[in-house]
Regions:
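N-terminal amphipathic, basic helical "cap/leader" segment at the start of enzyme domains
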Residues: 1-146, 315, 321
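Conserved beta-strand/loop scaffold segments within soluble protein domains that form the structured core
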Residues: 111-115, 124-395, 409, 413-447
Length: 447
């Protein structure tokens, strides 16, 4: 319990400071989250959803926290240059876990659309935030969600009213910046009302060569006939620990797409919980992981079919080299009465070295009798025959290996809807395989 004790002691001693620098709406659920965290403790590897990542070890170091909300000396526009060519975006910044108001884009939003500091909106429009905040992210079941809820003081709030479609993709840059080892606790709340449509690109970067621990909780509500595309790209460094929990709720005839791409990291654990609340909905959940050295990437998903006539599609692909460790555990739950469910779940993995390790566990749990559900996983190495064939035609073995890995991972990238983003990722992935992309491509954040 040593890992938990430091956070329990921290909250006991500093809870008033935390509350003084946060909105009342966030504070209303804070004490309950603390009680839940104290009861749960960090999960051990005996807990099914956490058996591939040692959470006790990740949270054991003594990180600093900016509880007094001191302003971080950083100019995002001076340090960040990593845009996606030909993609018209509204650009926002979160520095550590604070919404950066000094860099708000000079873009007129559609009527009624809100993109702002979660803490500020919670103070100005508490009834709107209170309706959604903490309703999906269950602190009673997950210790990381409880810890984030008990410590988070700010983040991002996005609200898209009924039948409004955002003209531009919303790009959110999460920048980690500190002169000391630091823990940050980010919160994101996304609400798409009936008939709304929005596309998001979240990019994670580390500006300093320090040890960072970032917890993140995203709650996304997708109303009837609404359309959400959520893309998450991580390009940090080997000293970064990222623990992200994403919760998505879909209403009738809605569509959601969640794409997570890990190109550079230290230790990453991504959890996705998606629930169908209305019939006729569909989701597309894709993951792309490229890892080498001692990187560790763990993706854990739960797709909960609670109602009939819904469709879920999952495809996660990993390319692991050197001593990298990958894990994928995906559970599709089809509840009683959720007839006519269609579900496809696939995890394909390529180990490019003898020391790379991959753990995979796709699962189906079905309590309805009129469904079409399939799942599968593979772990393999590069095809020697294909390599030999390419060498015989004058292609260098290293180049042949790169081409095969690139072709393998492209299936995931091609499923993304934003063409400029697809083109950019093709470029980044190729440079990553060639060893030409050490950290963030196109910016000087990590130099």
């Amino acid at each position: 319990m040593q890992s938990e004790k430091q956070y329990i002691d921290l909250y006991t001693e500093a809870q008033q400071i935390i509350k003084d620098h946060a909105a009342p709406v966030m504070n209303e659920v804070r004490d309950k989250a603390f009680d839940d965290f104290r009861r749960l403790g960090f999960p051990t590897k005996k807990v099914e959803r956490y058996k591939y990542t040692d959470m006790q070890k990740l949270f054991e170091p003594d990180y600093g926290l900016n509880l007094n909300r001191l302003e971080i000396p950083v100019d995002p526009y001076e340090t960040f240059r990593c845009d996606v060519p030909n993609l018209s975006t509204s650009l926002y910044f979160i520095v550590n876990d604070q919404f950066y108001t000094k860099a708000l884009p000079n873009v007129k939003l559609n009527d009624g659309v809100v993109i702002d500091s979660l803490s500020r909106v919670a103070k100005e429009r508490p009834e709107l935030v209170k309706k959604y905040y903490g309703k999906l992210a269950d602190t009673e079941k997950d210790a990381v969600t409880a810890l984030n809820t008990m410590l988070a003081q700010d983040g991002l709030f996005i609200y898209v009213p009924k039948n409004v479609q955002l003209d531009r993709t919303v790009q959110v840059i999460n920048i980690l910046r500190s002169d000391v080892d630091l823990m940050v606790n980010r919160r994101v709340l996304i609400v798409l009302e009936e008939g709304a449509k929005a596309q998001f690109l979240f990019c994670d970067h580390a500006a300093d060569d320090r040890n960072f621990l970032a917890t993140q909780v995203i709650e996304a509500y997708v109303g009837a006939n609404a359309n959400l595309e959520l893309n998450c790209l991580e390009e940090t460094h080997a000293k970064n620990v990222r623990v992200s929990n994403v919760y998505i709720e879909q209403q009738r005839d809605s569509r959601a797409s969640h794409n997570v791409i890990t190109l550079h990291n230290g230790v990453t654990r991504n959890m996705l919980d998606l629930v169908f609340k209305g019939e006729g909905s569909e989701c597309f959940c894709n993951g792309c992981v490229i890892a080498d050295k001692n990187q560790h990437v763990d993706n854990n998903t739960l797709i909960d079919h609670q109602v009939p006539h819904c469709t879920s599609n999952e495809l996660y692909k990993y390319v692991l080299d050197e001593n990298a460790v990958g894990a994928f555990a995906g559970r599709v739950l089809v509840r009683k009465g959720a007839q006519k469910t269609l579900s496809q779940e696939n995890n394909r993995n390529l180990c490019a070295s003898k020391t790379a390790r991959m753990f995979t566990q796709p699962m189906l749990e079905i309590y309805a009798d009129d469904v079409q559900c399939n799942h599968g996983s593979t772990v393999g190495q590069l095809n020697d025959a294909a390599l030999f064939y390419m060498e015989q035609r004058g292609i260098d073995r290293k180049e042949a290996k790169l081409l095969l890995e690139f072709a393998f991972i492209n299936e995931v990238i091609d499923k993304m809807e934003l063409e400029p983003l697809r083109d950019r990722l093709h470029h980044l992935v190729e440079k990553r395989f060639r060893g030409e992309l050490d950290k963030c491509e196109g910016c000087n954040l990590c130099k």
